[in-house]
């Protein structure tokens, strides 16, 4: 299957933009009997499928790669520069956008009397549920959204309960390294996930997804979780990290993770928490 991955830096930028905008009043039309939705955000596409609304989707972005059948939908382009012409050609009633899409493009969509919802990553883990509810409201799947949220909360609670009985492991979750060191700092939802999974986030004192090499070396965590770099495999990224100064001085175990699952807030966030728990648990 063709895979569309975001660069670590692009993932970080996407997480910094923390916006949950309501449906735009401009260009709104009455709720149609048949919705046609274009999703410009991967986690939104995943959520629509999880809520059983896949039949409403008529278009997606290049990065909407899960579930696999989503890739059969027409793509309107990238997250940050979708084609207005392509969007309009699909005759959608609703466009659900990420915060990357230029305001002028969304304004043009609204001028075509198409409803626009701009939605992006949330600052807290709890915000994941808000995102699911927002999408459920748009596609009239409110009860399905609440059911999904209930199932996710049960899974999260089970993981937290188990993690609470186990020793903590010091963890550093990295999205980039080298000239720019990016990590899950204390002001991020991934910090919450590390803590829920039984880890002690050594980058808790950092902000805005950035951390210093000096502090990382000083903290010397037990486990480093590393997102694969653009165009590189998990193994290649880990090898580069381990052989690059000053990271090569660290004694930590280094493990990779699938950023598509872990960094996308949506229906797979409980699964992502289980992944983080399992990675941490292997170091106890």
Which residues make up each language-model segment?
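Short, low-complexity disordered leader/linker segments with a strong preference
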Residues: 1-34
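Basic- and aromatic-lined ligand-binding clefts that recognize polyanionic substrates
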Residues: 35-48, 143-197
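Structured C-terminal subdomain patch of bacterial secreted/periplasmic proteins
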Residues: 35-36, 127-137, 146, 157, ...
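A short, structured surface patch at a secondary-structure boundary
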Residues: 36-101, 105, 202-205
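His/Asp/Glu-enriched short active-site or ligand-binding loop at hydrolase and phosphoryl-transfer sites
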Residues: 61, 186-209, 255-256
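Flexible loop/hinge segments that line or gate small-molecule binding clefts
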Residues: 66, 101, 105-134
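Short helices/loops that flank or line small-molecule/ion binding pockets
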Residues: 84-91, 111-112, 212-223
């Amino acid at each position: 299957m063709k895979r569309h991955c975001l660069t670590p830096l692009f993932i970080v930028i996407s997480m910094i933009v923390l916006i949950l905008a309501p449906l735009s009043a401009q260009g709104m039309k009455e709720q149609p009997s048949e919705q046609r939705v274009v999703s410009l955000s991967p986690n939104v596409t995943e959520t629509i499928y999880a809520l059983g609304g896949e039949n409403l989707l008529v278009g997606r972005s290049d990065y909407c790669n899960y579930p696999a059948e989503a890739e059969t939908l027409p793509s309107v382009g990238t997250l940050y520069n979708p084609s207005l012409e392509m969007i309009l050609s699909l005759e959608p009633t609703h466009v659900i956008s990420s915060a990357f899409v230029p305001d002028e493009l969304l304004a043009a969509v609204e001028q075509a009397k198409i409803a626009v919802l701009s939605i992006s990553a949330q600052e807290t883990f709890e915000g994941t549920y808000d995102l699911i509810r927002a999408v459920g409201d748009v596609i009239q799947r409110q009860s399905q959204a609440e059911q999904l949220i209930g199932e996710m909360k049960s899974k999260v609670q089970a993981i937290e309960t188990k993690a609470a009985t186990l020793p903590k492991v010091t963890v550093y979750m990295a999205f980039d390294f080298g000239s720019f060191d990016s990590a899950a700092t204390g002001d991020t939802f991934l910090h919450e996930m590390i803590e829920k999974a039984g880890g002690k986030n050594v980058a808790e004192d950092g902000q805005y997804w950035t951390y210093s090499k000096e502090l990382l070396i000083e903290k010397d965590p037990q486990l480093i979780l590393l997102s694969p770099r653009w165009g590189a495999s998990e193994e290649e990224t880990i090898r580069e990290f381990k052989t690059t100064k000053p990271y090569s001085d660290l004694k930590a175990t280094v493990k990779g993770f699938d950023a598509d699952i872990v960094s996308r807030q949506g229906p797979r966030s409980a699964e992502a928490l289980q992944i983080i728990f399992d990675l941490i648990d292997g170091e106890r």
